[in-house]
């Protein structure tokens, strides 16, 4: 059983909707009974107290809260609980799939994310008009998840485009996410990695792997699927390739080749099998025969790719 807790700032609308909760220093420990309690007076840390209060322009109130989770294996109890679990992932206190995230979409609100903070979707044009006296209003998106870097900035990583990494992503030290890379929540890297493609929800990429430009990895949200896809150590997904099975260590998927679970692949001995039967195997090269068009899989000798150390000295 793993417990977690955190003191944070919640943005709440006039009708009680929780837009966000920021936990600057979450912990893997319990500091009281499970649930969320609003803090007042001396219970509010001094560095957070000055940030609380009403924001009339956004029609919200920022309040201090303490959220405690007795067991991360249990489903989230409320919106604050979900936000704490997402922070734990991006703070690298938990790895993808170590905390139960069942039902989170029903607990999170759709939010207008702006340079002045989160705003309610309903009536936003009126809110925008009030905010304009502060300056230009930039809308980063309308979504249930914000950009990770607006809440957590993990050490030892590079993120070329902040819009491409959602809160709840787990980026290990040494990870570089280039402009076209994308990392969803409850997904990410476990070691030094180059990310120029898409790491979908639930996908885990191990140390030393390279997700090439435009490459796509199917996630647990794809078509309502439940398959959790893992990419092992020192693997390469070539540019514009795709992956719907897990890879062991030292594997390569040729550029432009999409390997789904049902893809028929021809082995070195001429046998034809579904790619799912090879899920999790190591030292494999998936390629397309340029003459016949057939997808082939052959054994690879030695270790896989080697990343450029200079690109990951973050």
Curated annotation (Swiss-Prot):
<feature type="binding site">
    <location>
        <position position="198"/>
    </location>
    <ligand>
        <name>succinyl-CoA</name>
    </ligand>
</feature>
<feature type="binding site">
    <location>
        <position position="274"/>
    </location>
    <ligand>
        <name>succinyl-CoA</name>
    </ligand>
</feature>
<feature type="binding site">
    <location>
        <position position="239"/>
    </location>
    <ligand>
        <name>succinyl-CoA</name>
    </ligand>
</feature>
<dbReference type="InterPro" id="IPR019875">
    <property type="entry name" value="DapD_actinobacteria"/>
</dbReference>
<dbReference type="GO" id="GO:0019877">
    <property type="term" value="P:diaminopimelate biosynthetic process"/>
</dbReference>
<dbReference type="InterPro" id="IPR011004">
    <property type="entry name" value="Trimer_LpxA-like_sf"/>
</dbReference>
<keyword id="KW-0479">Metal-binding</keyword>
<feature type="active site" description="Acyl-anhydride intermediate">
    <location>
        <position position="196"/>
    </location>
</feature>
<keyword id="KW-0028">Amino-acid biosynthesis</keyword>
<dbReference type="GO" id="GO:0000287">
    <property type="term" value="F:magnesium ion binding"/>
</dbReference>
<keyword id="KW-0963">Cytoplasm</keyword>
<feature type="binding site">
    <location>
        <position position="216"/>
    </location>
    <ligand>
        <name>succinyl-CoA</name>
    </ligand>
</feature>
<keyword id="KW-0012">Acyltransferase</keyword>
<dbReference type="InterPro" id="IPR001451">
    <property type="entry name" value="Hexapep"/>
</dbReference>
<protein>
    <recommendedName>
        <fullName>2,3,4,5-tetrahydropyridine-2,6-dicarboxylate N-succinyltransferase</fullName>
        <ecNumber>2.3.1.117</ecNumber>
    </recommendedName>
</protein>
<feature type="binding site">
    <location>
        <position position="213"/>
    </location>
    <ligand>
        <name>succinyl-CoA</name>
    </ligand>
</feature>
<feature type="binding site">
    <location>
        <position position="180"/>
    </location>
    <ligand>
        <name>Mg(2+) 2</name>
    </ligand>
</feature>
<dbReference type="GO" id="GO:0005737">
    <property type="term" value="C:cytoplasm"/>
</dbReference>
<feature type="binding site">
    <location>
        <begin position="254"/>
        <end position="255"/>
    </location>
    <ligand>
        <name>succinyl-CoA</name>
    </ligand>
</feature>
<keyword id="KW-0460">Magnesium</keyword>
<dbReference type="Pfam" id="PF14789">
    <property type="entry name" value="THDPS_M"/>
</dbReference>
<feature type="binding site">
    <location>
        <position position="262"/>
    </location>
    <ligand>
        <name>succinyl-CoA</name>
    </ligand>
</feature>
<keyword id="KW-0220">Diaminopimelate biosynthesis</keyword>
<keyword id="KW-0457">Lysine biosynthesis</keyword>
<dbReference type="InterPro" id="IPR032784">
    <property type="entry name" value="THDPS_M"/>
</dbReference>
<dbReference type="GO" id="GO:0008666">
    <property type="term" value="F:2,3,4,5-tetrahydropyridine-2,6-dicarboxylate N-succinyltransferase activity"/>
</dbReference>
<dbReference type="InterPro" id="IPR026586">
    <property type="entry name" value="Type2_DapD"/>
</dbReference>
<feature type="binding site">
    <location>
        <begin position="287"/>
        <end position="290"/>
    </location>
    <ligand>
        <name>succinyl-CoA</name>
    </ligand>
</feature>
<comment type="subunit">
    <text>Homotrimer.</text>
</comment>
<dbReference type="GO" id="GO:0009089">
    <property type="term" value="P:lysine biosynthetic process via diaminopimelate"/>
</dbReference>
<dbReference type="Pfam" id="PF14602">
    <property type="entry name" value="Hexapep_2"/>
</dbReference>
<comment type="similarity">
    <text>Belongs to the type 2 tetrahydrodipicolinate N-succinyltransferase family.</text>
</comment>
<feature type="binding site">
    <location>
        <position position="163"/>
    </location>
    <ligand>
        <name>Mg(2+) 1</name>
    </ligand>
</feature>
<dbReference type="InterPro" id="IPR038361">
    <property type="entry name" value="THDPS_M_sf"/>
</dbReference>
<comment type="function">
    <text>Catalyzes the conversion of the cyclic tetrahydrodipicolinate (THDP) into the acyclic N-succinyl-L-2-amino-6-oxopimelate using succinyl-CoA.</text>
</comment>
<keyword id="KW-0808">Transferase</keyword>
<comment type="pathway">
    <text>Amino-acid biosynthesis; L-lysine biosynthesis via DAP pathway; LL-2,6-diaminopimelate from (S)-tetrahydrodipicolinate (succinylase route): step 1/3.</text>
</comment>
């Amino acid at each position: 059983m793993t417990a977690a807790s955190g003191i944070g700032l919640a943005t709440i609308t006039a009708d009680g909707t929780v837009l966000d909760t920021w936990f600057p220093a979450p912990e893997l420990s319990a500091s009281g009974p499970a649930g969320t309690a609003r803090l007042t007076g001396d219970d509010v840390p001094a560095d957070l107290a000055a940030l609380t209060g009403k924001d009339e322009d956004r029609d919200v109130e920022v309040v201090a809260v303490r959220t405690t989770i007795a067991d991360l294996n249990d489903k989230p109890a409320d919106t604050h609980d979900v936000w704490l679990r997402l922070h734990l992932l991006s703070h690298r206190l938990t790895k993808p799939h170590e905390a139960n995230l069942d039902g989170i979409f029903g607990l999170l609100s759709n939010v207008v994310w702006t340079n002045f903070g989160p705003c309610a979707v309903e009536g936003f044009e009126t809110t925008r008009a009030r905010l304009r006296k502060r300056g230009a209003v930039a809308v980063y998106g309308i979504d249930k998840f914000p950009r990770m870097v607006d809440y957590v900035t993990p050490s030892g990583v590079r993120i070329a485009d902040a819009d491409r990494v959602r809160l709840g992503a787990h980026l290990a030290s040494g990870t570089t996410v280039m402009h076209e890379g994308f990392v969803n929540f409850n997904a990410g890297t476990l070691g030094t990695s180059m990310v120029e493609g898409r790491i979908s929800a639930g996908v885990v990429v191990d140390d030393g792997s390279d997700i090439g430009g435009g490459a796509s990895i199917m996630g647990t949200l794809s078509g309502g699927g439940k398959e959790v896809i893992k990419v092992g150590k020192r693997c390469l997904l070539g540019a514009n390739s795709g992956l719907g099975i897990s890879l062991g260590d030292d594997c390569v998927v040729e550029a432009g080749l999409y390997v789904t679970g049902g893809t028929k692949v021809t082995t070195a001995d001429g046998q034809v099998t579904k790619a799912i039967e090879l899920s999790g195997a190591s030292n494999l090269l998936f390629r397309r025969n340029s003459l016949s068009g057939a997808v082939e899989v052959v054994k690879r000798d030695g270790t896989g790719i080697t990343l450029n150390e200079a690109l990951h000295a973050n």
